Amino acid sequence: MSVIQLLHGTDHIIEVPDIHIGNPHNDYGMGFYCTRVDEMAREWACKKNTDGFVNSYDFDTEGLKVLNLLDGTHTVLNWMALLLQFRTFKLDSEVAVDARDYLIGHYSIDLTGFDVVIGYRADDSYFQYAESFVSNTLPLRSLNKALKLGKLGEQTVVISQKGFDHLHFINAYPVSRSVYYPKFLDRDTKARDTYRKEIKKSKSYRDDIFVLDILREEMSNDDPRIQRILFE
């Protein structure tokens, strides 16, 4: 048996999570979005500038099928493809539209049969990176670097009824907006500052890869040019 603790920060207590309550346009579609990092859960609880709660659960992963996008066998492009599949992007050019279709067609992963997804969390600041990559203004190296800023950007999402049945509520504790809303804003601001720096630096990356290069060269996940940048 492998039991881990999952935390869900929100504005109310959730003793029994419901698979039917959620947003189908979240990062990985409908599901229960959690973190294993207490500070992250506290920030989520107060992200609307209200007091909130961190709900704590024991989660038994025994017998569950887990897709771990961070285990080294997948790349940031797999994450991008799933994001493009579920989230609503601003596609204001033909390149962006073609990039969406190509990445979904060649890099997406069928979530059917999976109970849990572990991957990056595309909050507003991270989502800005993703949109810029699809629009061909941010290179792959900068996108990959941005998503490795720290574990606070990682999440565990329960996406099947079988997975929900493995969640066991422990307790919930209150979180003050006066403490954690400023922290939420500060982290977002730092991520945006890093984004601007990466955009500026990307102009000098002569050997980098932009999404248009991936389209023109029809690059796959195991292309040595992509591997060189992602694992340098």
Positions of the model-derived regions?
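Short His-Asn-centered micro-motif
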Residues: 8-10, 34-36, 57
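Short, charged/polar surface micro-motifs in flexible loops or helix N-caps
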Residues: 13, 38-40, 62-65
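Extracellular structured ligand-interaction cores
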Residues: 4, 31, 54
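Conserved NAD+-utilizing ADP-ribose enzyme module
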Residues: 2, 48-52, 61-232
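ADP-ribose/NAD+-binding catalytic cleft of ART/PARP-like enzymes
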Residues: 1-27, 231-232
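Extended interaction regions within the primary functional domain
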Residues: 12, 20-22, 57, 67-71
